[in-house]
């Protein structure tokens, strides 16, 4: 149960209302995280723009980004993000075996390129101060420095989202939720 109130569609105005309507058109619901951020519409606007920039642009495949988002969320035990990004990873072609192996990438059916990104993501999530040089060097064998920045941005963004959602005890958003609020 949420530890903070969720702004309803009818109470939202301006930028928050625009974000809500966009999410309804895209997903058929208003994510609970958006409904919390709507308490401060300028934060909702910048969060939404950052999310779109990290996940919707660049050259790292969306499938890899979704696996990283899900891996970070699993490591941080964030039910809200796990529920949402399991669905999104599957839509991008991730298999159940891959999803189940995200916290133990050595046993998972990943390409060498994916495994390098996931090793880095796991190390960054567990302790960003102690990412081994060998993990970063392996990443450089498969990705440009610009792509490595993209990968780190996904992990960092979801570390932020995970802590935000965990602190407020947000449960996963249900289909159609928020549309009639």
Segments and roles (model prediction):
Residues 1-181:
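Hydrophobic alpha-helical segments
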């Amino acid at each position: 149960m949420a530890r903070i109130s969720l702004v309803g569609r009818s109470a939202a105005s301006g930028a928050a209302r625009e974000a809500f309507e966009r999410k309804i058109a895209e997903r058929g619901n208003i994510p609970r995280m958006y409904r919390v951020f709507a308490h401060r519409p300028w934060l909702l606007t910048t969060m939404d723009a950052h999310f779109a920039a990290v996940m919707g642009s660049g050259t790292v495949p969306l499938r890899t980004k979704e696996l990283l988002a899900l891996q970070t969320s699993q490591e941080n035990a964030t039910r809200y993000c796990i529920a949402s990004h399991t669905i999104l990873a599957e839509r991008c072609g991730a298999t159940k075996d891959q999803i189940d192996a995200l916290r133990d990438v050595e046993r998972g059916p990943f390409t060498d390129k994916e495994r390098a990104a996931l090793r880095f993501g796991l190390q960054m999530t567990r302790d960003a101060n102690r990412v081994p040089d060998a993990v970063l060097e392996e990443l450089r064998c498969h990705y440009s420095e610009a792509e490595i920045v993209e990968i780190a941005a996904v992990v960092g963004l979801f570390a932020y989202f995970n802590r935000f959602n965990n602190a407020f005890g947000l449960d996963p958003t249900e289909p159609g939720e928020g549309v009639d609020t």
